[in-house]
């Protein structure tokens, strides 16, 4: 579930993304590929970003469900949380690889920006504070939570 511009974006296992108003009334549906595999989603502007943890990818589509890009990386598996910065860069956890991956706003490039040397150990939570340009990363294994500056 994600809240954006007074709308809730909901993903239930095996279903497309549903859009609801703040009272919970479904106002639309956004078709997705492999909806049963969607783990996390986030919205920025008119784009929806979600992880497909079975097929190891992050997908960016518009609010009509038209795919803009997808980025495949074998490190994107279970607990594949993501977050987006103001520039549309995607930050996704590589749970078993103990890394945080940044994917460019066009989906064409990626790089590891945080790893075990930054105390990343089974990361499960990630959030971008777009105003302060900070990335919060939380580990499952040891309970560590760290704040990192986002440098583009």
Name each region found by the language model.
Residues 1-14, 33-54, 74-89, 97, ...:
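Beta-rich, blade/repeat-based domains predominating
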Residues 16-18, 56-58, 98-101, 143-145:
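Structural signal for beta-propeller blades
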Residues 20, 61, 84, 103, ...:
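Hydrophobic alpha-helical segments, especially N-terminal targeting/anchoring helices
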Residues 21-25, 62-66, 104-108, 151:
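Short loop/turn segments that connect beta-strands within beta-propeller blades
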Residues 25-33, 66-72, 109-116:
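A short beta-strand motif characteristic of beta-propeller blades
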Residues 28, 37-39, 51-69:
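Histidine/lysine/aspartate-rich catalytic loop segments that bind and position anionic ligands
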Residues 91-93, 101-102, 111-113, 125-127, ...:
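Conserved active-site loop/cleft motifs that coordinate metal ions or position small ligands
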Residues 120-152:
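Blade-level signature of beta-propeller repeat domains, shared across WD40, Kelch, NHL, RCC1
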């Amino acid at each position: 579930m994600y809240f954006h511009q007074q709308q809730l974006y909901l993903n239930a296992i095996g279903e497309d993304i549903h859009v609801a108003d703040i009272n919970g009334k479904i106002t639309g549906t956004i078709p997705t590929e492999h909806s049963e595999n969607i783990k996390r989603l986030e919205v920025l502007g008119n784009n929806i970003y979600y992880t497909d943890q079975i097929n190891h990818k992050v997908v960016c589509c518009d609010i009509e469900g038209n795919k803009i890009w997808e980025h495949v990386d074998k490190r994107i598996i279970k607990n594949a949380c993501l977050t987006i910065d103001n520039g549309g860069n995607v930050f996704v956890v590589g749970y078993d690889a103990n890394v945080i991956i940044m994917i460019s706003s066009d989906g064409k490039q990626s790089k590891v920006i945080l790893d075990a040397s930054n105390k990343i150990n089974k990361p499960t939570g990630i959030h971008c504070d777009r105003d302060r340009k900070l990335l919060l990363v939380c580990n499952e294994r040891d309970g560590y939570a760290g704040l990192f500056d986002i440098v583009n």
